[in-house]
UniProtKB/Swiss-Prot annotation:
This is Cytochrome c. The modification N6,N6,N6-trimethyllysine is found at K80, K94. Keywords: Acetylation, Electron transport, Heme, Iron, Metal-binding, Methylation, Mitochondrion, Respiratory chain, Transport. The keyword Heme applies. Pfam families: Cytochrom_C. It is found in: Mitochondrion intermembrane space. InterPro entries: Cyt_c-like_dom (IPR009056), Cyt_c-like_dom_sf (IPR036909), Cyt_c_1A/1B (IPR002327). Belongs to the cytochrome c family.
Length: 111
């Protein structure tokens, strides 16, 4: 199922998902440093593997995904299937609502 078929995202619910499942490895604030994963500020419209100062896997650089609602929705279902060889150990969010909520939060928090 594509992002167009996803339920409407709730940014507040997405923030909770980010804090429990993503924040140990990622930051969203402008100017915040990288953790185990890259800072996600400015994520939408950026190509995968291009955040300055972060050491990406060759897989992330070579995949050249342009991050947006559709690509994030597919990626967050199963990151290792979407980008084989990614360093991201997160298994993914299986529920469409969880992915839609997280994307709604990321759109607000990384802009």
């Amino acid at each position: 199922a594509s992002f167009q078929z996803a339920p409407p995202g709730b940014a507040k619910a997405g923030e909770k998902i980010f804090k429990t499942k993503c924040a140990q490895c990622h930051t969203v604030e402008k100017g915040a440093g990288h953790k185990q994963g890259p800072n996600l500020n400015g994520l939408f419209g950026r190509q995968s593997g291009t955040t300055p100062g972060y050491s990406y896997s060759a897989a992330n650089k070579n995949m050249a995904v342009n991050w947006g609602e559709n690509t994030l929705y597919d990626y967050l279902l199963n990151p290792k299937k979407y980008i084989p060889g990614t360093k991201m150990v997160f298994p993914g969010l299986k529920k469409p609502q969880d992915r839609a909520d997280l994307i709604a939060y990321l759109k607000z928090s990384t802009a």
